[in-house]
Amino acid sequence: MVKLRLKRCGRKKRAVYRIVAIDVRSRREGRDLRKVGLYDPINNKTHLNVPAILYFIERGAQPTRTVNDLLKKAGVLKDTGIPVVGTLVSK
């Protein structure tokens, strides 16, 4: 299964995160399938490759909770009520 998740880059005390499509069995710093965006939490900037993100989501990739929030904030995803993998759903 493929996930869209954050991969830490940058230097000490100055983290920048790449948004990558990666196999769930890979480590955080493991080899990614494709880089699809960049998130800078200090400057609060986000750069997204929207066609690539939609390509992976259409083929079943699940964004993590943080990436899902970033995509909603950027307007790429709508709040559809579909649970993200790793979240608790009460019935």
From Swiss-Prot:
Xref: SUPFAM superfamilies: Ribosomal protein S16
SS bonds (residue pairs): none
Any GO molecular function: structural constituent of ribosome
Subcellular location: Plastid, Chloroplast
Matches recorded under InterPro entries: Ribosomal_bS16 (IPR000307), Ribosomal_bS16_CS (IPR020592), Ribosomal_bS16_dom_sf (IPR023803)
Keyword Coiled coil: no
BP GO annotations: mitochondrial translation
Main location: plastid
Keyword Phosphoprotein: no
Keywords: Chloroplast, Plastid, Ribonucleoprotein, Ribosomal protein
GO annotation, cellular component aspect: chloroplast; mitochondrion; small ribosomal subunit
Similarity field: Belongs to the bacterial ribosomal protein bS16 family.
Protein name: Small ribosomal subunit protein bS16c
Species whose genome carries this gene: Pelargonium hortorum
